[in-house]
Amino acid sequence: MPTAGKGTYRELLRQGEHLLRRRVHPAPCDDAATDAFLLLEKVSGLNRTNYPLKKDERYPQAEREEYLALLRRRATGEPVQYILGEWDFMGRDFTVGPGVLIPRPETEQLAEAAIDYLRKRPKCRVLELCGGSGCIAITVAKTLPAANVTALELSPEAMEYLRANMARHKADNVTAVQGDALCPPPTIQGPYDAILSNPPYIASGELPTLQREVRREPAMALDGGTDGLDFYRGFNDIYPRMLAPGGLLLYEIGEEQGEAVAALLRNAGLERVAILRDVYGQPRNVLGYAPDEN
């Protein structure tokens, strides 16, 4: 029988919140209460539903020791998503860890816009550039099971997560291809009904100013060059011509990049170019369409 601790789960959670608020360096954890609870969930099996019923139960000592070890990792600035080993994207959990970009809620808008468009083309071919964990490609593929989705990713570390998530979600209609999106391998051949990407778009000079948790993510998934636009420029010379007639090119962008990226798409001959704003009113995506067949 596990050795009982001296306190209750309620007290242990309070201790976790206190540690993250007081001992995280160089600044306190902004989401101390949330992170403390997520880490307690991981070690105890408690959740938001059963915690109110069990908060006054005594915890096993082994759970406390494991919990404190996870808290110490979080206190050094390690992202809570890496500690948990998974994170939610549009209702599915994706395996993540060091070496891969963490799925973010704002990226869900890209996946939703792509799915809305592709529902009219159920037997579609889709290409995702800079596939990372596979959260976009797999979400599209699972929502549209008749789709044929290819995810292109350069990083060997990220490819491991991509393949693990394909297996986890039984995404048999996704193909993972390792290669450079700026110099795609010969297997990447159009026409595609949609080409999607959340590429690196942070200006190189801004990387040192990012939150310390973000700085733990791979630089190659963040660094977009001097002005953050290197990947969009490089893609512009390659991918618009891989679109099927009427096909969609859809990017995630930084808040100040909408007009510049929209201009690139227009210069590539795409039509109906538009900037999509997120729920906070900030530019979040740019899209354009290949001309329809006459």
Residue spans of the language-model regions?
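Non-catalytic accessory regions of SAM-dependent methyltransferases
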Residues: M1-R48, P52
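Conserved hydrophobic residues forming the short capping helix/wall of the S-adenosyl-L-methionine
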Residues: L20, L118, M166, Y239, ...
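Residue-level signal for inorganic ion chemistry
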Residues: L39, G77, T107, I136, ...
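Conserved AdoMet
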Residues: L40-D116
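Short loop/edge segments at beta-strand edges and connector loops
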Residues: L84, Q178-G179, I253, R277
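Conserved SAM/SAH cofactor-binding pocket of Class I
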Residues: E106-P208
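Mobile active-site "lid"/loop adjacent to the S-adenosyl-L-methionine
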Residues: Y201-F231
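Conserved Class I SAM-dependent methyltransferase catalytic core
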Residues: T226-Y289
